[in-house]
Each structure stands twice: as C-alpha cells, then as structure tokens.
Design a protein with these regions (language model features):
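Acidic-basic catalytic patches of nuclease active cores, encompassing PD-(D/E)XK
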Residues: 2-50, 142-155
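Short, positively charged
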Residues: 47-55, 59-60
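Conserved catalytic cores of phosphodiester-cleaving nucleases, focusing on short active-site segments
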Residues: 56-58, 65-72
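Short, charged/polar surface micro-motifs in flexible loops or helix N-caps
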Residues: 65, 73-76, 106-109
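Helix-rich interaction surfaces within compact, conserved domain-sized segments
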Residues: 112-155
C-alpha cells in the first residue's frame, strides 16, 4: 500500500466536514514561550531506557488514532524511539480503531508548518509503508476519509 498524492474529493462530506471544522492554518500554539523550554529527561533514565516524545497525536472519535513524528532533513526514526512508537501504535490498533504512525520530514530552520511536512513513511496494522510527494495534512485527510467514518449511533 503506497500513500500517494491524490485529489481530495471536495464532494466527500466526511472530508469536507473535517476541513470546515478544522481550518488548515488554525494556530494551536497557546504559549510559545513554554514551547521553547528545554525538557531535561536525564533524571528518568533506567539503564538503557529513557523517555521519548511524540510530535503530534490526533484522536478522531476513538475510531482513528494518528501519531506524528517529524524529522529534519530525511533523518530516520531509529532505535529505541522507533521501537517505542511502533509498540504504542500497534497496541492502540483494535478491531474498532485504526492506529497509524506517520513519520514526516522538513527542511525548515525556523517555524515548521507541520501540516506541510512531507510524509516519509507510515505504519498501519503493524507494517511500514514508504510514501512520497504527499503532505501530512493530505495524508491525514485520506486516512480520515477511509478509517474514521463515524456512524450516527456513535455520536
């Protein structure tokens, strides 16, 4: 399964509804000063185990979980961070919920528009897939339209 750029069908009420309720350029950073604080996890090292972070997480009605990790300039997800995020993503996958881990790249030295970062690879149902030429925003819209159909009785 290759994730590739495609035209998002504007008539698709699910995608249209998502786009209307979540404009692409909505600034969600509430306190930039706190964002720039360095978090020191050195006091939480247990042998070779240390904490990792997640750059983004979206929960679409408990039907679709999307984890996002963003890397600079084609850096790869590796080692303990890769293993931890794989395990988290796979553990959240259930019969009624799809869980996806998306790794993106950026070349920015300043502020990063995460939605415009390019998808490098993604993990779905325990398998890694390579991707090219699609932004994170486009990928999320595609996954949403395929996996997060919320039934009326679930509302």
């Amino acid at each position: 399964m290759w994730l590739r750029r495609r035209n998002i069908v504007k008539e698709d009420s699910v995608v249209r509804g998502m786009a209307e309720s979540c404009p692409p350029k909505a600034n969600m950073i509430k306190n930039k000063e706190h964002l720039q604080q360095i978090k020191d996890f050195s006091g939480l090292k247990f042998g070779s185990i240390s904490p990792t972070d997640i750059d983004g997480f979206l929960d679409f009605g408990n039907r679709l979980f999307i984890f996002v990790e963003t890397k600079f300039s084609k850096s790869e997800l590796r080692g303990g961070q890769k293993l931890a995020l794989e395990r988290l993503c796979d553990a959240c996958q259930t019969q009624s919920r799809t869980s996806i881990l998306i790794v993106t790249n950026h070349e920015s030295s300043g502020e990063i528009d995460i939605g415009e970062t390019v998808v490098q690879q993604y993990r779905l149902r325990g398998v890694w897939y390579e991707s090219t030429d699609i932004t994170l925003r486009e990928a999320i819209e595609m996954f949403y339209s395929n996996f997060a159909i919320i039934k009326k009785e679930d509302k």
